[in-house]
Amino acid sequence: MRKTLFSGVALAAVIAFGGSAWADVLVGIGIPVTGPNAVYGAQIQKGAEAAIKEVNDAGGINGEKIAITIGDDVSDPKQGISVANKFAADGVKFVIGHFNSGVTIPASQVYAENGILEISPGATNPQYTEQGLWNTFRTCGRDDQQGTVAGQYIFDHFKDAKIAVIHDKTPYGQGLADETKKKLNELGTKETLYEGVNVGEKDFSALIAKLKQAGVNVVYWGGMHPEAGLLIRQMADQGLKAQFISGDGIVSNELASIAGDAVAGVMNTFGPDPRDDKANAELIKAFRDKGFEPEAYTLYSYAAVQSLAQAAKAAGSNDPQEVAKAMKEKGPFKTVLGDLSYDEKGDPKLPGYVMYKWEKGADGKYNYIQQ
C-alpha cells in the first residue's frame, strides 16, 4: 500500500508498506494534519488506515488493493480546494474526509466534477448533502438533527434560564448554533444573547462581561474545542457560573487539557459511542495497544471505509459512480457503527444524537460520559 502526504499542493515522499508499492485503487484522506483541528485529523487518518489495512489483508476491493494519499487541508476552505484538485490530478477515486463542513462543502464540488466519491466522517452541516450531488456521503449525523436534540434538552432541563447562543462564525459552528436556536425558538424560548466570535480568539473577557451583565446561566457554544476550552476556563476564572453546552466539535480530550477542572459538568451532543459496543472490543484494544485512543471520529472513519468496500463488492465495480449507487441501494453494511445504510442524499440511517457530560474518572482524568 502506498501512502503520500502533502500540504495543499506540496507533495512529500512516498512511503510504501505491505504488498506492491503501487496499488490499483487510490483513496485520498483529506484532513487537517496541522492547524487547530489536527487532533480530529489524526482520528480520521488512524481510523481509515486501520480499516484499509483490514480490507487489503482480505484481498482488497474486487481484487484490487487500496493505496492511500493524505492531503492536509489545515481546516481552511481554500486549502481544501487545493487538496481536492491535487487528489483529482493524482487519480484519486474515493475520499475519506474532509472534517470541517466549511472545507468539505466546496471540496465536494471539485470531487463531483472529477468523478470522485467522498465520505465525510465529520462534516455535519446539512448543506453538504443537500447540494444534489451524486457523490456526497457522511457517516456522522447532521446539525439539524443535533441542534434539535440540544435545543430540546435545554428547554426540558433549563426552564426559565437565560440562554446565550455563541458561535465561531464558521459553516459548522454557526450552522449548529442556528439549528439549536431554531429549536429553542420553536419551543417558545427566546435566547438572551446571540453572538459570534472569531476562530483563534484567545481573550473572551469582553464577551464574558456581557454574559454576566445579561444574567446568562446557560451558554450554548457552536464551534470547536480550542476556543471552547478557553471560554470555559475564562468563564470559571471570571466567576460566571453558567451551564456550558456544545456539540460534536468539542469531543476531544484536548478540551480538558485547555479548560482544566472547569470542564467538569460541561455537556455536549454526539452520536452513541461505538467504543461501548462489545462487538468492537478487539478493535478498540488493538488501537489502545498501539497507544492511540480511538475516540470521537476514529471509528466513524473506519466505518466509512467499511461501507465503501462493501458497496464496491455489492456493485461488482470500483467505479465511483457505481459504488455511490450501491451505497444508496445495497445497504445495510456491517460496520463498527452497526448496520449502516445511506439515504438518497448520502446521509446515514443511524441512531441520532445523545447527550454527554464531562466527568472526572477514577484515574483522575476527565472524559465525556454518555448520559
Swiss-Prot record:
Chain's role: Component of an amino-acid transport system.
One of the GO biological process terms: amino acid transport
Pfam families in the cross-refs: Peripla_BP_6
Signal peptide stretch: 1-23
Entry's family note: Belongs to the leucine-binding protein family.
Species of the source: Brucella abortus (strain 2308)
Protein known as: Leu/Ile/Val-binding protein homolog 1
CDD domains: PBP1_ABC_LIVBP-like
Record key words, sorted: Amino-acid transport, Signal, Transport
Source species taxonomy: Bacteria, Pseudomonadati, Pseudomonadota, Alphaproteobacteria, Hyphomicrobiales
UniProt keyword Cell wall biogenesis/degradation, yes or no: no
InterPro entries: Leu-bd (IPR028081), Leu_Ile_Val-bd (IPR000709), Peripla_BP_I (IPR028082)
Keyword Transport assigned: yes
